[in-house]
Amino acid sequence: MTQSLQVKLLDPRFGDLWPLPAYATEASAGMDLRAALEAPMTLEPGDAALIPSGIAIHLDDPQVCAVILPRSGLGHRHGIVLGNGTGLIDADYQGPLLISTWNRGREAFTIEPGDRIAQLVILPIVRVSLQVVDTFVDSARGAGGFGHTGVR
């Protein structure tokens, strides 16, 4: 199933130098977001920066949200991850998408203009109403917390 997504191009390099965000394969869950930088940016170990994506989106459907996630290769190979873990974009937000980028690695890393540095995933939302209770019906796990189910 494909739905439309309103996108505003905030950087004129889209269309000429850079393609619009798109799914890389038929089964891709996310679309890559680019670093809409004017010049290369070097992140020293421990540094964080807000990097513009060059686009704004408007989901306009309260039953979906967007999340910005790291690209696995950048995180695994270079320690480049999102400074906020995951970026959550509400359906009524219309501003520019900024990517909180953090170098948790041991070496400086340079991001070039147009580099694909994160991915955008659209997800369904289930809204709930809270029901205050005194006790829960027993479950197999109960209140077992971190490590409760073991490693093996």
From Swiss-Prot:
PANTHER family: DEOXYURIDINE 5'-TRIPHOSPHATE NUCLEOTIDOHYDROLASE (PTHR11241:SF0). This enzyme is involved in nucleotide metabolism: it produces dUMP, the immediate precursor of thymidine nucleotides and it decreases the intracellular concentration of dUTP so that uracil cannot be incorporated into DNA. This is Deoxyuridine 5'-triphosphate nucleotidohydrolase. It comes from Xanthomonas campestris pv. campestris (strain ATCC 33913 / DSM 3586 / NCPPB 528 / LMG 568 / P 25). Substrate binds at R71, S72, G73, N84, L88, I89, D90. InterPro entries: dUTPase, dUTPase-like, dUTPase-like_sf, dUTPase_trimeric. Its EC number is 3.6.1.23. SUPFAM superfamilies: dUTPase-like.
